[in-house]
Amino acid sequence: MSGEDVRIDNMDLAILIKKELERKGIRKNGINGILGFQISKNEELEQIKDLNIINTNIGEIDELEKLPNLRNLKISSVNMRTMLKGEIMTPDDRYNYESKLSGIKDFSVIERLGKLEILQIDNEKNLKRIDTENLKNLVSLKLRDNPNLKEVRGLDFNEELSELDLEHNRGRWFEIK
């Protein structure tokens, strides 16, 4: 499997991966129209250790599993409280705000990213629960300003965890298991 190309169907994720590869100075194959983004697995995808999905409408994240060495994942949507302090929102402002929401509905793929060391998720209205049991290498977990987060599971299994920040999660009932 070392020389095989891996197809990333989520174009927004493909663009983020492309930017990360460019930042690292790694040559990439490019975007092939609407068919997806072809990347050599060993030479490129395996080199991505950090990924920031910040103020970017990405939708699905199930293809994060195609990044086998991902160590640091940050996901954050724009925070409405800090975007416009006391100003009236115009239609342009609303469009700008909505384009900065991640659009992620299902975060369960994160539970299968076993090499993660740092996980940060901020301002995600669709994050309701997360299970970190399989994230054995997790050192830092920051879950902040997620209004519907109600449950964090598996912390007992995160023996390397040295930083935990569960600030401003406004779920009515919040349970740590």
Regions found by a protein language model. Name each.
Residues 14, 114, 131-132, 154, ...:
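Small side chains
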Residues 52, 74, 111, 120, ...:
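Extracellular beta-strand solenoid repeats
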Residues 64-65, 86, 132, 154-156:
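Short amphipathic alpha-helical segments
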Residues 69, 114-115, 134-139, 157-160:
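Short "repeat-start/strand-capping" segments in structured domains, especially the N-termini
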Residues 71, 103, 129, 133, ...:
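A detector of tandem-repeat and repeat-rich interaction/domain scaffolds
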Residues 80-91, 146, 167-174:
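Long amphipathic alpha-helical scaffold regions
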